[in-house]
């Protein structure tokens, strides 16, 4: 399909005169368009669930979440990868965002980078891609050559490939094991896919990465138990997590967190099972670090 025929490139009838609207009407119109995003993403629930299940299997075997994209799509992948480190306490090398043109492209567009399939292959080769890895290819238009090249190389290696696009029957979808296509319709500003398409991609990435982390045992009930308390805000959050899941006082939560060397999950197990540090460590080791499995026995 030619670029001009893509849904993401069509003019939106609802915003034809946005340039002459009052500020409040402008805001309301964009907001109304944004409300369509969650509905579009909802049509892909089954595919997103499939992506989570398959990705979780690979991740548990040591695989990595690797995001590839150009422009806004690439930046969203980098953002999702970066946030997983402090949120779930994973090592930075377990979630990696690749953007066409390299790190500099996060801030300034690198002309022509997205048009190279070979560039993506080289970027993935540099990471020593393997069959346990998960490659998520993002392209609002569903046709970015950089993403296609990366997905093809990943498939050849045997890695799991997931495509995320905002058009139906996307080109990248034909190069992936699982194709997620949230059709959000024309943008409020024609072709500005950082808007609805970007929001849809972010929502989908939120669900996939969160789902994978939940299945690794990094969430107990609905709290983050592998959060790394590296500043005062996160230390306070860690203590509140311990309090709300165990019912202890603030001082006891803080004291136990210190005894557990700032490991929230370990502190919870110590308190819930009335164990000392080593006993709690052994309980967690027996359940591969899964707090819920320890406490549900």
From Swiss-Prot:
Its EC number is 4.2.1.126. The active site is at residues 83, 114. CDD domains: SIS_Etherase (cd05007). Belongs to the GCKR-like family. MurNAc-6-P etherase subfamily. It comes from the Bacteria. One of its GO terms (biological process) is amino sugar catabolic process. This is N-acetylmuramic acid 6-phosphate etherase. It comes from Lactobacillus gasseri (strain ATCC 33323 / DSM 20243 / BCRC 14619 / CIP 102991 / JCM 1131 / KCTC 3163 / NCIMB 11718 / NCTC 13722 / AM63). A lyase-type mechanism (elimination/hydration) is suggested for the cleavage of the lactyl ether bond of MurNAc 6-phosphate, with the formation of an alpha,beta-unsaturated aldehyde intermediate with (E)-stereochemistry, followed by the syn addition of water to give product. Homodimer.
């Amino acid at each position: 399909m030619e670029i001009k025929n893509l849904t993401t490139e069509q003019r939106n009838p609802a915003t034809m005169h946005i340039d002459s609207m009052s500020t409040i009407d402008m805001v309301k119109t964009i907001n109304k368009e944004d409300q369509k995003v969650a509905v579009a993403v909802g049509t892909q629930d089954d595919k997103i669930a499939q992506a989570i299940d398959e990705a979780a299997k690979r991740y548990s075997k040591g695989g990595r979440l690797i995001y590839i994209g150009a422009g806004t799509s690439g930046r969203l992948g980098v953002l999702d990868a970066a946030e997983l480190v402090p949120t779930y306490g994973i090592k930075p090398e377990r979630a990696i965002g690749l953007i066409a043109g390299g790190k500099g492209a996060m801030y300034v567009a690198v002309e022509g980078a997205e048009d190279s399939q070979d560039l993506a292959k080289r970027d993935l080769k540099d990471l020593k891609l393997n069959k346990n890895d998960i490659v998520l290819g993002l392209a609002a238009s569903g046709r970015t050559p950089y993403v296609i090249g990366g997905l093809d190389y990943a498939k050849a290696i045997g890695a799991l490939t997931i495509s995320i696009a905002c058009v139906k029957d996307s080109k990248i979808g034909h190069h992936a094991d699982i194709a997620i296509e949230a059709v959000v319709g024309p943008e409020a500003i024609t072709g500005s896919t950082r808007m609805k398409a970007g929001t849809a991609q972010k929502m989908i990435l939120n669900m996939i990465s969160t789902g994978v982390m939940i299945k690794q045992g990094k969430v107990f009930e609905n709290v983050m138990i592998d959060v790394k308390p590296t500043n005062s805000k996160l230390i306070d959050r860690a203590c509140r997590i311990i309090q709300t899941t165990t019912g202890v006082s603030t001082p006891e939560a803080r004291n136990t967190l210190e005894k557990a060397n700032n490991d929230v999950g370990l502190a919870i197990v110590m308190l819930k099972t009335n164990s000392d540090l080593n006993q709690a460590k052994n309980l967690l080791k027996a359940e591969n670090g899964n707090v819920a499995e320890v406490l549900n026995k």
